[in-house]
A protein has these predicted regions:
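Conserved donor-binding/catalytic core segment of Leloir-type glycosyltransferases
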Residues: 10, 181, 196-218, 224-227, ...
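Membrane-proximal helix-turn-helix segments that form the acceptor-binding/catalytic region
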Residues: 28, 82-91, 121, 127, ...
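Glycosyltransferase donor-sugar binding loop
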Residues: 41, 45, 211, 236-248, ...
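Short His-centered aromatic/hydrophobic patch
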Residues: 99-105, 123
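A short, active-site helix/loop in glycosyltransferases that binds the activated sugar's phosphate group
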Residues: 107-108, 136, 143-188, 328-329, ...
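A charged, aromatic-enriched C-terminal amphipathic alpha-helix characteristic of glycosyltransferases
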Residues: 177-178, 194-195, 341-345, 355-384
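Nucleotide-activated donor-binding/catalytic signature segment of Leloir-type glycosyltransferases, i.e.
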Residues: 205, 247-280, 290
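Nucleotide-sugar-dependent
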Residues: 218, 269-274, 283-309, 320-328
């Protein structure tokens, strides 16, 4: 049985933890509520001081695998897998094992089933079948079996909870833990941020901003084209790390529009600093299947972006695509608008509408941000 004074919550995440702001939020929430946390992940050295300097926090850093030679990459991946599994074996009686993505469940493998009675399985994406390895089209990892055996399932959005329960025939409805920032402090301004801040301060046009992953399920092209048509009044700033295929296409996109400015990637929470200089924010989700990802075709339709909480917390009204995960909070709280289609004229109308109703949407943002109580939800997951 979990004893808060004696036991810890061991969080496992595959990939660099700094690419997952919701995981940082979870760690901050757990620490602030007096739990001991041990993180097993890549990128631990870049964690914010508020986490690393907490006496209740410890970690095992897994070295990243970066090599163009497929044989060396496979060899290093094998070493990486052993590192995760060794960290799992360090789990003490009563500790909670909290996995953050299906990739780490696949990596931990059958050994994880030994901890099923205290395994919290968090799903950042709406998941169906999962590839045995990245890009695999036929070979599948039985992620459903691990979910059915897990103690608790956690998802970031209510519709996803019901879909996941039915799709995987789960006994209980998953907990809903929104992707909301625990703190909205960007921290000390670093030297590499100064040129970007100065650039945004000098810009006289109204600034539309996108913060987040740059990937196939984000339709930046349509918004860039629309902003270009009203570039005398607006410009578009993109921040984020590219993921997946299509790097050349993204470079062409950046080169094609004079109103578009790509500013690179900044580790969270530093990226929040740039929201101080923005007027409107984008959430450009593109519904559809991403082959080999393991996410269902409904993933983007029922999106649950941490960005809408970051934007709302920083009082930035939003424009998004027409997906239910955005339409519901936008209409309930009046904090943004969804474009019914992605024609330039439709997007421009949305920009003009948000601009005209900016002050009202800013006032409404606080009510939306305050609607989720992370402390209550996380304590319920751990203790119920």
């Amino acid at each position: 049985m979990f004893d808060k004074k004696k036991n810890m919550i061991r969080i496992f995440i595959y990939e660099n933890v700094m690419l997952y702001p919701p995981t940082l939020n979870l760690i901050e929430c757990l620490l602030n509520n007096g739990y001991k946390v041990h993180l097993v992940a890549e990128g631990v050295r870049d964690l914010p001081a508020i986490i690393k300097e907490n006496k209740q926090f410890s970690y095992t850093e897994i070295k990243a695998v970066k090599n163009s030679n497929i044989f060396l990459r496979l060899k290093k991946r094998s070493v990486k897998t052993k590192g995760y599994r060794a960290a799992l074996k360090d789990t003490m009686d009563g500790d909670i094992v909290w996995t953050v993505n299906p990739s780490v469940v696949r990596t931990l493998g059958k050994e994880l089933l030994e901890y099923s009675d205290r395994h919290v399985m968090q799903l950042m994406e709406l998941t169906d079948t999962y590839p045995m390895f990245r890009g695999a089209k036929i070979l599948k990892f039985n992620i459903k079996h691990y979910a059915q055996k897990a103690w608790k399932i956690v998802v970031p959005e209510e519709n996803r909870a019901y879909i996941q329960k039915v799709g995987w025939n789960l006994e209980k409805l998953p907990y809903v833990l929104p992707n909301k920032p625990y703190y909205l402090k960007s921290g000390e301004v670093q030297e590499d941020m100064l040129p970007v801040i100065e650039e945004m301060k000098r810009e006289k046009r109204k600034k539309i901003i996108y913060l987040g992953v740059i990937s196939a399920d984000r339709d930046l092209q349509s918004f860039a084209e629309a902003v270009e048509r009203v570039k005398e009044d607006y410009c578009l700033y993109l921040f984020g790390k590219f993921r997946g295929d299509g790097a050349e296409e993204f470079k062409k996109l950046c080169d094609s529009y004079s109103s578009l400015k790509y500013m690179g990637f900044f580790n969270p929470p530093k990226h929040l600093e740039f929201l101080k200089y923005a007027d409107i924010a984008l959430v450009p989700y593109k519904p559809g299947e991403i082959e080999g990802s393991g996410f269902t075709i409904l993933n983007a339709l029922y999106c649950a972006p941490n960005k809408i909480y970051e934007y709302a917390g920083c009082n930035i009204p939003m424009i998004g695509t027409d997906v239910l995960g955005l339409r519901e909070p936008f209409e309930k709280y009046n904090i943004g608008v969804c474009c019914r289609d992605l024609k330039p004229e439709t997007i421009i109308d949305a920009i003009r509408y948000v601009d005209a109703n900016h002050d009202e949407m800013v006032k409404n943002s606080k009510a939306f941000f305050d609607s989720a109580d992370l402390d209550y939800i996380v304590n319920s997951i751990v203790n119920d």
